[in-house]
Amino acid sequence: MGLIRKKLPFIGRRKKIEVECLFDTGASSSSICPELVRALGLSTADLAKPVRIRLGKGSTQVSRIAAVTIRLNGTTLADTAYVMPGLSEEYILGAEFLERYDIRLDPKRRRLLLPPKRRLALVLV
């Protein structure tokens, strides 16, 4: 399991905000705190059926997702995140996001290993 923190610009309808993100290979999906959803003015949708998300010390029920836009290495990337009240971080980038964009973590050196910018942009097509 790897954990890395990095500040990234998030683009919302209301404004652009630098957000401290946790890149977490142990989390299958991405999660966002409701306060950040409101601050950015993000679009959300109700899940057809609430899901229970397991956390390190228990679990929580989630009923909404948010469409998120992030800038990484000069490229705009899309993500979908569970809106999770009581989240300890503002944003957690999970394994689905990391795999989709072929992002690797180097926890020992605390850095992200990104594909070439051209290849990262091709994933969006």
Regions found by a protein language model. Give the residues of each.
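A compact, surface-exposed functional segment
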Residues: P34-T69
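Aspartyl protease catalytic core from the pepsin/retropepsin fold
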Residues: M1-L22, G58-K108
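A short acidic Gly-Thr/Ser loop motif
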Residues: L22-S28
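Cysteine-centered loop/knuckle micro-motif
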Residues: S30-I32
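A short local loop/turn or secondary-structure capping micro-motif enriched for an aromatic residue
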Residues: A27, G86-E89, A121-L124
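Charged phosphate-binding loop/patch that engages nucleotide di/tri-phosphates or the phosphate backbone
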Residues: K108-V125
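Short, surface-exposed beta-strand-loop junctions and turns on beta-sheet-rich folds
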Residues: R38-A39, E99, R118-L122
